[in-house]
Regions:
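N-terminal cap/lid segment of alpha/beta-hydrolase-fold proteins
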Residues: 1-26
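Alpha-helix capping and helix-loop boundary segments enriched in small/acidic/polar residues
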Residues: 3, 43-47, 77-85, 115-119
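Active-site-proximal beta-strand/loop segments in catalytic clefts of secreted hydrolases
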Residues: 15, 30-34, 65-68, 115-119, ...
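Short substrate-entry loop that stabilizes the transition state in hydrolases
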Residues: 19-25, 33-64, 68-74
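Loop/turn elements at helix/coil->beta-strand transitions in domains of secreted/extracellular proteins
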Residues: 23-27, 57-63, 108-112, 140-144
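Alpha/beta-hydrolase active-site loop
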Residues: 80-103
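Primarily recognizes the serine-hydrolase "nucleophile elbow" in alpha/beta-hydrolase
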Residues: 96-168
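Accessory cap/linker subdomain of secreted extracellular hydrolases
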Residues: 148-226
Length: 226
């Protein structure tokens, strides 16, 4: 699902280790870090150096969701730092991959692991929380969760982006405080949003990011900054 809860066609990469016939493998869901080009999405980059492929060489069945906004869903804004759609991309891929394994006769040993780095660390924690809240059958197989270097404190992450904008635009940057932007006009709000997004996205990015993570921070919407 996207940030509005609407169903979208999503994609990802499944990497299967070479083992003797009938051998069973643990399942590892790997959530990738922040990327800015669709060609870097796992399903578009199935090469030997891709992290998920390397992990599969260690004996895991590795699932690597592209995330909404990449792969089959390119064109849909990527829900960066929005926990619900981020978690859904991982949990839905877990379910789809389980169905595929049954159809392809790829045996797993009933063990599930979650890991991710950078944005993938955030997505991993969001997915773990979603599994706990739903009581999903995947939770019964979950053995370990290892998130790494993620922007778990979204407030702090956004404060870092604000500092980058303040360095570039000190006058406008002085006005950027959570909750204060509501008192500015629409043009000022759009400019602040543009500057914050530019601080994150490189100029050659070929995907779009949903700006709600910025809007919620600027609105001081603590309930959703998580």
């Amino acid at each position: 699902t996207d940030a509005d809860g609407k169903e979208v066609r999503a994609s990802g990469l499944i990497s299967v280790p070479q083992k003797a016939a009938g051998a069973k493998s643990p399942v590892l869901s790997y959530q990738h870090g922040t990327i800015f080009k669709d060609a870097e999405a796992p399903s578009n980059n199935a090469v030997a150096s891709e992290v998920s492929v390397v992990l599969a060489s260690l004996g895991y069945i590795v699932l690597a969701p592209d995330y909404v906004g990449f792969g089959a869903s390119k064109g849909t804004p990527h829900p960066y730092l929005l926990s619900a759609p981020s978690a859904a991309a991982t949990v839905d891929f877990l379910t789809a991959a389980r169905t595929w394994r049954g159809q392809a006769n790829v045996a797993d040993n009933g063990q599930l692991f979650l890991t991710g780095y950078s944005e993938g660390g955030y997505v991993t924690m969001a997915a773990h929380r979603a599994l706990q809240a739903s009581g999903s059958t995947h939770l019964q197989q979950l053995r370990m969760v290892v998130p790494g270097a993620g922007p778990y404190n979204v407030q702090s992450t956004m404060d870092g982006l604000v500092e980058l904008v303040r360095d570039e635009q000190p006058v406008l940057g002085a006005l950027i405080n959570p909750g204060f932007l509501r008192y500015l006009g629409g043009s000022a709000q759009r400019e602040v949003r543009r500057l914050l997004l530019r601080a994150l996205l490189p100029g050659d990015a070929d995907v779009t990011y949903d700006t709600r993570f910025i809007d919620r921070f600027l609105a001081d919407d603590v309930q959703y900054i998580a």
